[in-house]
Curated annotation (Swiss-Prot):
The protein, known as: Ubiquitin-like modifier-activating enzyme 5
Residues that span the membrane, as ranges: none
Similarity comment: family membership: Belongs to the ubiquitin-activating E1 family. UBA5 subfamily.
One cellular component term from this protein's GO annotations in UniProt: cytoplasm
Domains as described in the record: The UFC1-binding sequence (UFC) motif mediates interaction with UFC1. The linker region is required to activate the active site of UFC1: it region moves next to active site of UFC1 to reduce the amount of water molecules in the vicinity of UFC1's active site and thereby elevate the nucleophilic activity of UFC1 active site.
InterPro entries in the cross-refs: D-isomer_DH_CS1, ThiF/MoeB/HesA, ThiF_NAD_FAD-bd, Ubiquitin-activating_enz
Gene Ontology terms, MF aspect: ATP binding; protein homodimerization activity; UFM1 activating enzyme activity; zinc ion binding
Binding site for ATP: 81, 102, 125, 148, 182
Effect of residue 248 to S/A: Abolished ability to catalyze the first step in ufmylation
Annotated region described as Linker, given as residue ranges: 346-376
């Protein structure tokens, strides 16, 4: 019985792929890529070189070697509003391999977000995304899985693929990206990555569609998703009970694009080692506010593998050689006497300096004055008086005219 169900499932996937090709053909695409595969990236500035603008990052001193992007494999869980745009950006950047995980189908309700097109409605998101992404960049390797990672059987397969599905079979992926829209899937990814010691990044958009965030999680070094869980997770509330019929979360393509953009930017900085990698970066569209922070791991985390990773990280940190602080040389005091015979002369004479200060009062020991009051000088100009000549104003004006 199980074998027949599996065969039927495979047949359904084959028919879905065939349907995708037929719909693409009818929509005007021939289903084939517009160019052949490029074996090696080139920095040659040509209209026909899709990597010239990317390779310019090396010439401008941003990245030491952009070609390394083709040596990395990234797994994306959730190919929706954020995940599909993230996959597209990484594909255009020339990533080596993408592994896509999602069990949902494309719907017309998804059209307010980015990437998918109306003719793809009814197809699985991973297969529709793979077909489009291959046309964008045939140099990227793709591996798609159309299932729910939170089920027991599929969770084991998910762990197997992120630990063995790297660019070379048997090697782990370099990074896992969470672009899901529920806490159950986030906790599943968190559990898998803590057990495997796999670095991953989490992303999310709020239900009102005007805020979002990304978070980098390195097991043992930074907080995992269970170290400071949301209230829904901490209270063990079933998310499905919170949903109401006829009510859905809001969604803006702008917010999805911003969150996907900062996520991929953080991925590139992490993989290619340039700039500052953010451990947490938020986005509030109402105030254009981008908060950032670092979250330390919780020693009492509910995930035992997280606590285990913390202990291993402490051991690795303790084994590193300690760097002694280098003694700082004190700057030599520069005296007024010098070999060139240059002498500093004050613009104020000794007599003027003496007259500008007053007598120092007698004070108890330990008390000094900040300044003294100079003696009052008698202004001789104030004593000059002019005698009254007795002439009227008219006489004085007449005299001035005759001058």
């Amino acid at each position: 019985m199980a074998d027949s169900v599996e065969r039927l499932r495979q047949r359904v996937e084959e028919l879905e792929q065939e349907l995708a090709r037929e719909r693409t053909r009818r929509s005007g695409g021939d289903g084939h890529c517009g160019r052949t595969r490029i074996q090696e990236m080139s920095d040659e500035v040509l209209d026909s070189n899709p990597y010239s603008r990317l390779m310019a990052l090396k010439r401008m001193g941003i990245v030491s070697d952009y070609k390394k992007i083709r040596t990395y494999a990234v797994a994306i869980v959730g190919v929706g509003g954020v995940g599909s745009v993230t996959a597209e950006m990484l594909t255009r950047c020339g990533i080596g391999k993408l592994l896509l995980f999602d069990y949902d189908k494309v719907e017309l309700a998804n059209m307010n977000r980015l990437f998918f097109q109306p003719y793809q409605a009814g197809l699985s998101k991973v297969h529709a995304a793979e077909h489009t992404l291959r046309n964008i960049n045939p140099d990227v390797l793709f591996e798609v899985h159309n299932y729910n990672i939170t089920t027991v059987e599929h969770f084991e397969h998910f762990m197997n693929r992120i630990s063995n599905g790297g660019l070379e079979e048997g090697q782990p992926v370099d990074l896992v990206l969470s672009c899901v829209d529920n806490f159950e899937a986030r906790m599943a990814i968190n559990t898998a990555c803590n057990e495997l010691g796999q670095t991953w990044m989490e992303s999310g958009v709020s239900e009102n569609a005007v805020s979002g965030h990304i978070q980098l999680m390195i097991p043992g070094e930074s907080a995992c998703f269970a170290c400071a869980p949301p209230l829904v997770v901490a209270s063990n509330i079933d998310e499905k009970t919170l949903k109401r019929e006829g009510v859905c979360a809001a969604s803006l393509p702008t917010t999805m694009g911003v969150v996907a953009g900062i996520l991929v930017q953080n991925v590139l900085k992490f993989l290619l080692k340039f700039g500052t990698v953010s451990f947490y970066l938020g986005y509030n569209a109402m105030q254009d506010f981008f908060p950032t922070m670092f979250m330390k791991p919780n020693p009492q985390c509910d995930d035992k593998n997280c606590r285990k990773q913390q202990e291993e990280y402490k051991k690795r940190a303790a084994a590193l050689p300690t760097q002694e602080a280098e003694p700082q040389e004190e700057a030599e005091v520069v005296h007024e006497d010098n070999e060139w015979g240059i002498e500093l002369v004050s613009e104020v004479s000794e007599e003027e300096l003496k007259n500008s200060s007053g007598p120092v009062p007698t004070l108890p020991e330990g008390i000094t004055v900040a300044y003294t009051v100079p003696k009052k000088t008698e202004d001789s100009a104030s004593e000059v008086t002019v005698e009254d000549s007795g002439e009227s104003l008219e006489d004085l004006m007449a005299r001035m005219k005759n001058m």
